Amino acid sequence: MKRRRFALDIRPGAVALLAGLYFLLPLRWCVRLALAVVVHELGHVAALVLCGAEVYGLRMEACGLALRCAPPEGAVRTIAAALAGPAAGAGLFCILRGLGYPEGADLSLLYACANLLPVLPLDGGRALEAVVAALAGARAAERLLDVLGLVLPVALMGLGVALFARGMGLALGVFGAWLALLQPGMTCQGGKHDVKYSYYQM
């Protein structure tokens, strides 16, 4: 079978997102964030290749990055592919800490932990979906992730508002709103119900 050429799909929203980050963050933090994102995605790619899944491309949009690939076969491979990104981020944390770059290390760890939240289309949600589907069936997994996809973003937004009222910034609330936008039926969907491709968000 002929292999497909890797495709990079950059949406207009991605350009706006990158421009916003450039103007809102100091250049050094943009570089640190870019390093964390690249290492995270390379972790996914390495695991997918080792699991025998073909990677078709990378899509950049207003809600972040989505790695497009053939769905890995079996729960174990799906879990491994999902957790490989955060694992790579944790490895980068250790390396940067050892080299004396604590800011970049902490950002990489924060990025990895955020992706482990049990909500689709994040890595933690994909891993949880595979586990529940293997133990209780795909329908039970879908119902659980639907509930988490509603409850968790709302909880994060509520907590973010409470923290903002205490003068601690809006970051958590914005993150919760971003997660809400990634849920099916919203503006930025994570490809949850796509049967042809699997997407690894961020």
Task: Mark where each language-model region is.
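Hydrophobic transmembrane alpha-helices and their immediate loop junctions
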Residues: 1-202
